[in-house]
């Protein structure tokens, strides 16, 4: 199940507040969760089924015109503290670049954040397999088709802050 916004926001808030406490003049954080499922059928038989779940955080900190970014997939509190600390330490030793900064506040988007693009539909693995088996059956119902390169069903859900 995809993580709720509040879970991702909590991680983002922690990273931003910790980076400010350690000296960043500004910071940016991306917290994302992605779940991908793939099922493949070849010659009417299951050829493969994969599922992957990824959680990740990327923190960018600024100190004046210095900037550094660090990413992690470990969301433990100790690791997040280490992530922020390492990012701040890296920022301190990077050279200044006059173009390093976040956009001015007046340039930030102020409209509705929820674009309502998320599709809550979920098919079980068995439903996916039945769907693509049916597609292969239709292909094989034609006399001249004796082999296929297979059929597949892919589903990816993502949430990010």
PLM features per residue range, with description:
Residues 1-161:
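Active-site bordering "gate/hinge" segments
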């Amino acid at each position: 199940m995809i993580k709720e916004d509040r879970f991702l926001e909590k991680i983002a808030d922690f990273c931003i507040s910790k980076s400010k406490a350690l000296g960043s003049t500004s910071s940016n954080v991306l917290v994302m969760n992605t779940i991908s499922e793939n099922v493949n059928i070849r010659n009417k038989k299951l050829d493969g089924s994969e599922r992957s779940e990824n959680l990740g955080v990327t923190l960018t900190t600024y100190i004046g015109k210095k900037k550094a970014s660090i990413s992690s997939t470990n969301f433990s509190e100790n690791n997040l503290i280490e992530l922020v600390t390492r990012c701040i330490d890296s920022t301190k030793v990077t050279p200044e670049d006059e173009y390093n900064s976040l956009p001015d506040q007046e340039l930030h988007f102020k409209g509705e954040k929820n674009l309502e693009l998320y599709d809550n539909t979920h098919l079980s693995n068995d439903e996916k397999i039945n769907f693509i088996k049916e597609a292969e059956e239709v292909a094989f119902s034609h006399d001249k088709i004796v082999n296929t390169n297979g059929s597949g069903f892919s589903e990816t859900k993502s949430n990010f802050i």
